[in-house]
Amino acid sequence: MALRAKKPEAIEKRLKALFYGSAGVGKTTAAIQFPRPYLIDTERGAENDRYTEILKDSGGAIFQTTDFEELMVEVKSLLTEKHEYKTLVIDPLTTLYNDLLDKSAEYLKKNSKEKDATGTEFGRHYSEANKKIKHLVSLLNRLDMNVIITSHSKNEYAQNMAIIGSTFDCYKKLDYMFDLVFEIQKRGKDRVALVKKTRLEKFTDAETFPFSYTEIANRYGKDVLERDAIAQELASDEQVKELIRLIELIKVPEEVYQKWLDKSNSEKWEEMPKDAIQKCIDYLKLKINGE
């Protein structure tokens, strides 16, 4: 079989970043400095006049919710509808994650056969909540917008339980999913960013720099950060029905079509991009015809 690898090419990616820090350091202020922010406020923390003015000046908007499913509806709308916003800010995700943990435990308790079950046995509620967070992140990776998630901070411990610093207070693998992770700090009157994780050449691991949108834009590329979002067309009902029909006809193994979903960052066929699902349909039709 011929080798299928391609020579690597640089791709202009939207910024996907995680900001965390203690209360009052200015995580929200830092995040809404980015172009045309669509702020999803999960703590009603952006109601003061200062935040309102920043949002107005930057052409932003605010949506307040404490419900994870409402958040998902907004993300899907931003993914698939034409709009003027360029940066999605979820501030903070910690609140929604903790709510997911509580709801997952309650669901497991309700459906348990054990009378004294709490729903938290063996950390199963974490597994349930983490599935939903992974689904969210899959959609965020497809979103043609800058994405900034903020998180509360918590102490980070060494094996001997000595405090060695701070880390984000959320899904513990959240940092794997982002190109940049900043710990936002306040030093006197100045706000600084400590680079806790980077996949980008122009941001050095463990460096500290005065935080501003201008500084980020100079390093990342203003054109990338400020270009208009392009909506993504999802699979039609007809495409979904046709693909399911072909899968059943040919008896495609689940592990095969699950790879198709994973590759497109989709949890179900209805979430697949229109062009991606059409490639699957065309492939199966060729297979039927023996090509």
Predicted regions and their residues:
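Conserved catalytic network of the ASCE P-loop NTPase/AAA+ motor domain
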Residues: A10-E12, L78-H83, L139-L143, K173-D175
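Conserved nucleotide-sensing/catalytic segment adjacent to the nucleotide-binding pocket
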Residues: R50-E114
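Interfaces that engage single-stranded nucleic acids at replication/repair/recombination sites
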Residues: A2-K27, I32-F34, Y38, R44-A46, ...
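Short, glycine/polar-rich helix-capping loops at beta-to-alpha or helix-loop-helix junctions
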Residues: K27, G45-E53, C170
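Phosphate-binding/switch region of NTP-binding enzymes
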Residues: S22, S138-I216
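Structural motif
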Residues: L18, T87-V89, I148-I149
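Short, basic, glycine/proline-bearing loop/turn elements
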Residues: I11-A17, T52-Q64, A117-H125
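P-loop NTPase motor core
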Residues: P92-K173
